[in-house]
């Protein structure tokens, strides 16, 4: 018999690490699927009367599906809608505009941190314990960008300090990098797409990512690293404006551009350390990706 509780837990874990594609046991004949058409009004039969309509959603459950999470927000227009999200005094359009203005006004990391602390356009701030800004050496040549704080990060106010962070530190040490190193060539600087923990460690919604996106974009511009590393699917897909899952993006080099940068930055996508904790068999390919990062770093010209 199927262990339902285990199946649900496994599915929740897959969603948490960014899995976004389902593969069937048998190949799908898309030519047959495409040939199917929706029934016409005549074929579908008469419209339902109110008495035969589906029952309303039970109390405490939404009658509409949850907001779909999609990538490619880096180039998406501002989200519309004047209604404010729960816990936010701003509507989506106003929140995005407010974030963009506050982020662009910052010229130093300290300014950006203060602007983030003063920003109230994302409802996640209302439920989080801490604003998780960054950790490591801001002068490092390598900047790592994760997805969102977890429980330990929310408590301590720093990114990657839980079990996944411990593994990340070991991964970095294996190629001679350390978040606490003073020498920029041996240090890393770490931040996240979102500075606030989503309740229950759920994936952030499109609107939550969009509200915070201008801050991480400006963060990259001010820190001005030589290499970017995206940890996990949400980070990679959002900042690279890609639709592929992380298993297809990992190990590949991309050019990351932004108006505030003087040149495109080489960017590498890696599997999230949380994924590696649950799927140790993927460490082999991640090791190859880390070696690629080391070679790219060694090939950089000296900083002036």
Regions found by a protein language model. Give the residues of each.
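Non-catalytic accessory regions outside enzyme or core folds
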Residues: 1-24
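A polyanion-binding, active-site-adjacent surface
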Residues: 20-21, 25, 29-30, 37-304
């Amino acid at each position: 018999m199927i262990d339902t509780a285990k199946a649900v837990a496994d599915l929740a874990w897959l969603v948490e690490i960014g899995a976004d594609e389902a593969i069937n046991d048998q190949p799908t004949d898309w030519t047959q699927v495409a040939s199917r058409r929706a029934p016409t009004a005549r074929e579908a039969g008469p419209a339902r009367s109110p008495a035969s309509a589906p029952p309303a959603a039970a109390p405490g459950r939404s009658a509409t599906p949850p907001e779909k999470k999609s990538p490619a927000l880096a180039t998406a227009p501002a989200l519309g809608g004047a209604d404010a999200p729960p816990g936010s005094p701003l509507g989506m359009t106003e929140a995005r505009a407010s974030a963009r203005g506050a982020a662009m006004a910052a010229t130093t990391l300290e300014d950006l941190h203060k602007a983030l602390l003063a920003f109230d356009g994302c409802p996640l701030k209302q439920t989080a314990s801490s604003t998780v800004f960054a950790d490591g050496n801001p002068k490092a040549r390598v900047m790592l960008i994760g997805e969102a704080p977890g429980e330990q990060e929310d408590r301590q106010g720093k990114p990657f300090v839980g079990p996944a962070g411990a593994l990340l530190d070991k991964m970095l040490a294996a190629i001679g990098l350390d978040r606490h190193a003073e020498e920029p060539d041996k240090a890393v600087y770490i931040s996240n797409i979102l500075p606030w923990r989503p309740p229950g460690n759920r994936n952030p919604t499109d609107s939550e990512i969009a509200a915070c996106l201008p801050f991480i974009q400006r963060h990259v511009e001010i820190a001005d690293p030589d290499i970017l590393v995206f940890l996990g699917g949400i980070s990679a897909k959002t900042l690279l404006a890609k639709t592929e899952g992380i298993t297809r993006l990992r190990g590949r080099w991309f050019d990351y551009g932004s108006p505030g940068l003087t040149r495109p930055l080489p960017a590498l996508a890696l599997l999230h350390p949380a994924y590696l904790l649950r799927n140790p068999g993927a460490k082999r390919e991640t090791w190859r990706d880390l070696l690629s990062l080391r070679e790219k770093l060694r090939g950089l010209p000296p900083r002036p």
